[in-house]
Amino acid sequence: MSKLTLSHPESDHKLILDEETGLIREIVFSSNSISRAANVTTSIKLQIDGSERRAPTGGLEYFGTTEIIESKSTSAPEQAVTNDGIEWRMRANIGGVSAEYRYGLNRKGPGCTASIIFFGNQNVLVRNFSLSMSVQLPKDSWNVQIPGNGLRNFVPVQNITSGVGVSPIGGLRGSSGLILATSDSHGCVAIWPDNFIEIPLVEFKGNGADNFTVAIDSNFGSDLNAIKSVELPIFSADLSVRNWDEFPEIFDGWLRAKSITSPNNPPAWINGSMIYEAQIGFSVFNEKFKYSPYPEVSDLIADLDRVKSMGFNCIQLMPRQPYPSYNIHDYWDIDTSYGPKEMMIDLVKQCHSRGIKIILDILLHGVLDKEIIKRAADGVRNGPYAHLVSADTADSFAADVNDWDNYLIAWSRHILDFEKYWYEGSPEISSLVAEHPDWFYRDSANNVQGVYTKAFDASNRDWQNYFIDACRFLMTELDIDGFRFDAPSYNDFPNWSVWSRGRAGASALGCLGLFERLRPVMKSIKSDSLLYTEPSGHAFRQSMDLNYNYDEQWLVTAICDPNARSPWGISNAKDLAGWFESRNLMLPRGSITAHHIDSHDTFWWPSWGKKWRREQFTMPQVKLLTLVFATLPGPFMMFSGGEIGIESLLPKISSTKQLFLNGEDGISWWTQDWIPDDVFVQSRTIEGKNIIVAANFSNKIQNINDLRMGKIASVLVEAGEHCQYSEGKLSLPALSGVILSVERN
């Protein structure tokens, strides 16, 4: 096997390629007396041609495709100078498809990058491109860090014996998508699937103590006859960092190099806020159970004083249930979408008079009509989950990020539960389809497609104008304080319309450009308005003031149910604190996360009788979860009804959150050896005192024998049994927690 070496004086990295295939064989770093190398076995798979059809659970699936795994280089690498550094371009033939591998050595950001160009004027439909890398590391004990995903800190690579999903940078349930292998003697090896044009599926697997595999399934698609060329970023890599402690600051530079930054100027009111998610109307489960906390808007108005008394200072109002629910009827029809317009105006006034902000849940993914509802429901009845719709479902967020079975069973049941309500309220065919045919996802036969709505293409500029106008209308008409943008990347499937088929997978993240345009419009109407969205991935933090905590939700089940723990997930409360610390270190600066344990999402998908955390776990555990998640940096959110059993705890938590706004030194996570494994501890310095949050998740007394902070000044909050305190020592009863103010020595 002949090798080619790509190196340049501007870089301390070099890449060694297989001359025959053009694929990477080795990544090398050399600087001063330090030299590191990782041998790489790279394989690819190109899926082409065939046909598409609606999948049983919506979107599209392919059939009759051809899979190609052979790559043959057809030219020597040609060097070019780019804005980012030095790049080599190497032509390749992939089973008859003309392409070009591009490898870069960068002046800023990660040391090296890899991408592929597909050339146009070929009678080829690219359906997907996948790459797998088996990385052989120097002999050592290697651990892996994948911050913001379903692993605890520093898991031995050899322990990860099956594939673990890694939510990518544009993903729903993760953060950066970064994979970092660390060792004491050989530094760090970073692999970063950094494409945020598509939403790839990424998987990590250990192959022993010093070898791992990263598989990247790009979700890329292109009609090569429709374009001249198209470039697919695959991954970046770096071997220069000595240890984990140095990495967060370096990674912040990588993010800035890719313009992945937070606006870092959120409305001042959001920092210590408590958000109450309110539902008007009723939702239906298993055809016979209904949940209706507020049948009408007037019922919510009548309850505002109680909501305020629990410490909530923001209402997040869901779309009216069961119709239109989380679907689009008509943005300008306030009566149908949320409630009677005059009553909505009164609700906003009543909230504002009490010092409560109010935001609306607003939808992007698609419009309802009878045609698509019937198609979705028939797909469920004839699909792979039809026989399971009555089966028990658990917390969907406890599973691996690439395991959707539990969710899809619950989703299938949800479609059938809501079918008649959606059907009755919808037009036969939405007029928007005829009026604006280019606003919608389509298959190659030009049929409008979707999951259970007719899917909007959020990358379409004219549709973006329509949505921005709708937001402007709702803000000015109702005087609301912002929006929570529900499921902006929900249409995560290819759009093969005439105008988008050059890059069929790009529509799923078309919302990113929309949000960039929308932000200044909203801020011009209300400078302290809130932009808040559901996905946790870094790409969604670029234009948002606030993001959901989908990346955290697996932690709730893992800390409360030992049977739900994986060999690589958190195993105790100290792991929980460590997970938060590493995740937060890797967020774009200024990012804010809204934390919850009960939301309408966590409520909707489990079976009846196991919907609330208080039904899944014990009340003492729920109190501890509230103590922990509500005192994390950022707002705390709760779905209406989640407060049952913790009504007296919530206002105390709210007061503490207001106190945290005066913090001096940020947050400290107590993960030292002298902290018991089953105790979660974090602290802040406020006005010369340390405010300590401690929670014992075990069934026995736990002692912290060295508070290192002096004597206790006051007890702010207790959850569970009374705790015992003396100078420098804290004794926590089983399943109990406390917030203490401690004098600093």
Q: Predicted segment positions?
A:
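C-terminal beta-strand-rich structural cap/linker in extracellular carbohydrate-active enzymes
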Residues: 726-745
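Beta-strand-rich recognition/accessory modules
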Residues: 7-9, 93, 131-132, 171-263
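Substrate-binding cleft/loops of secretory-pathway carbohydrate-active enzymes
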Residues: 368, 374-378, 524, 532-569, ...
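Acidic-aromatic substrate-binding/catalytic surfaces of carbohydrate-active enzymes
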Residues: 2-91
